[in-house]
Amino acid sequence: MRVFKVTACVPSQTRIRTQRELQNTYFTKLVPYDNWFREQQRIMKMGGKIVKVELATGKPGTNTGLL
């Protein structure tokens, strides 16, 4: 199965005291090749930025933080 290992940074969902205080959340996940465009659109719509994309193999949707 072809999957992408995607590392992205998105702004946190919770609003803190002021709008200027934004915290970013970094995450890495495996995205199936067929769902790549949808995942890319989701990250961009949330105001995030894709940091790194690699080709990988494994189970889709798993958190790869411990690899």
Curated annotation (Swiss-Prot):
UniProt KW keywords: Antenna complex, Membrane, Photosynthesis, Phycobilisome, Thylakoid
Biological process annotations from GO: photosynthesis
Domain of life according to the entry: Bacteria
Main location: membrane
Topology of this chain in the membrane: Peripheral membrane protein
All residue ranges annotated as the CpcD-like domain in the record: 1-56
Gene Ontology cellular component list: phycobilisome; plasma membrane-derived thylakoid membrane
Compartment(s) where it occurs, according to its Swiss-Prot or TrEMBL record: Cellular thylakoid membrane
Disulfide bonds: none
Alphabetized SMART domains for the sequence: CpcD
Chain's role: Rod linker protein, associated with allophycocyanin. Linker polypeptides determine the state of aggregation and the location of the disk-shaped phycobiliprotein units within the phycobilisome and modulate their spectroscopic properties in order to mediate a directed and optimal energy transfer.
Family under the similarity heading: Belongs to the phycobilisome linker protein family.
Protein name: Phycobilisome 7.8 kDa linker polypeptide, allophycocyanin-associated, core
Annotated source species: Arthrospira platensis (Spirulina platensis)
Source lineage: Bacteria, Bacillati, Cyanobacteriota, Cyanophyceae, Oscillatoriophycideae
